[in-house]
Amino acid sequence: MNFAAALRWWRLSLPIADELEESLIWKLTDLGLCRLAVQHAPENSERTLLAWLPSSEWSESDRDQLMANLRPLAEPFGLKLANPTWCEVADEDWSLNWKQDWQPDPVGQRLLILPAWLDLPQEYADRFVVRLDPGSAFGTGSHPSTRLCLEALERNPPLGLRVADLGCGSGVLGFAALAFGARQVLAADTDCQAVCASRANTELNQLDLDRLRVVHGSVEALSAQLEGQTVDLLLCNILAPVIEVLAPSFDQLLSANGRGLLSGLLVKQAPRLQMVLEALGWRVNCLTEQGCWGLLDVSKR
């Protein structure tokens, strides 16, 4: 008997605004749910978050409690979560749900995020191409916080620099940094699935594994890889409260003249984060905004 095929799941379908994607995925992952997908096209702001929960483990009251845990995440954006749709389904290939809607995604003037299973469209032949198959790690380049980082890399290319990518997800920021001239990228993520996805995408982009080295962990793991050396640029696209916790250890990674691109924060969270960073001896050079999301460009004083 094929026990995997016999499994049944509650499939959650939840329409969401793009501002909520990152926070909801973070929360669901933190709750131990890893069968997740987001359906959307790059040109369409309408998105549907999908999650699969083992039906034998999730009663109606458990599912109601899950939604109660998710609803507060919409409040900082002045939004309310839509009503969820629950459907009991047989085992299905959940990882393919988002693939059917993902198309080639031009970013800025020079970069193209290309799904691994699609051919390069001729109209984008002059762009730097980053091929991605995120698997179960999120980071397709479509989220505003990711795009802020990608566009910042294009505006100020990291030519010849050594780069650290903290919270790398699918590896998209590291691949873009290399495309724009970085010498080497050291990447880390606390999610094992993200580490696996980044390593697989390194091979997909035909890169030497030493040019983009991926480790499991956080600042300490990157510091160990550096063996007493430092990087010139830190990319950190994670939620603002996490940046605040990690910020005191950024000195372990960055050189005296190093810069950081800190994204994943709401614009209204920027003043508090700026205050925290300045108290630690950092200078905030500028805040770039895209919708309600922001990116802080920081350097040492």
From Swiss-Prot:
<dbReference type="GO" id="GO:0005737">
    <property type="term" value="C:cytoplasm"/>
</dbReference>
<dbReference type="InterPro" id="IPR050078">
    <property type="entry name" value="Ribosomal_L11_MeTrfase_PrmA"/>
</dbReference>
<comment type="similarity">
    <text>Belongs to the methyltransferase superfamily. PrmA family.</text>
</comment>
<keyword id="KW-0949">S-adenosyl-L-methionine</keyword>
<feature type="binding site">
    <location>
        <position position="146"/>
    </location>
    <ligand>
        <name>S-adenosyl-L-methionine</name>
    </ligand>
</feature>
<feature type="binding site">
    <location>
        <position position="167"/>
    </location>
    <ligand>
        <name>S-adenosyl-L-methionine</name>
    </ligand>
</feature>
<dbReference type="GO" id="GO:0016279">
    <property type="term" value="F:protein-lysine N-methyltransferase activity"/>
</dbReference>
<feature type="binding site">
    <location>
        <position position="237"/>
    </location>
    <ligand>
        <name>S-adenosyl-L-methionine</name>
    </ligand>
</feature>
<keyword id="KW-0489">Methyltransferase</keyword>
<dbReference type="InterPro" id="IPR004498">
    <property type="entry name" value="Ribosomal_PrmA_MeTrfase"/>
</dbReference>
<comment type="function">
    <text>Methylates ribosomal protein L11.</text>
</comment>
<dbReference type="InterPro" id="IPR029063">
    <property type="entry name" value="SAM-dependent_MTases_sf"/>
</dbReference>
<dbReference type="Pfam" id="PF06325">
    <property type="entry name" value="PrmA"/>
</dbReference>
<dbReference type="GO" id="GO:0032259">
    <property type="term" value="P:methylation"/>
</dbReference>
<keyword id="KW-0808">Transferase</keyword>
<feature type="binding site">
    <location>
        <position position="189"/>
    </location>
    <ligand>
        <name>S-adenosyl-L-methionine</name>
    </ligand>
</feature>
<protein>
    <recommendedName>
        <fullName>Ribosomal protein L11 methyltransferase</fullName>
        <ecNumber>2.1.1.-</ecNumber>
    </recommendedName>
</protein>
<keyword id="KW-0963">Cytoplasm</keyword>
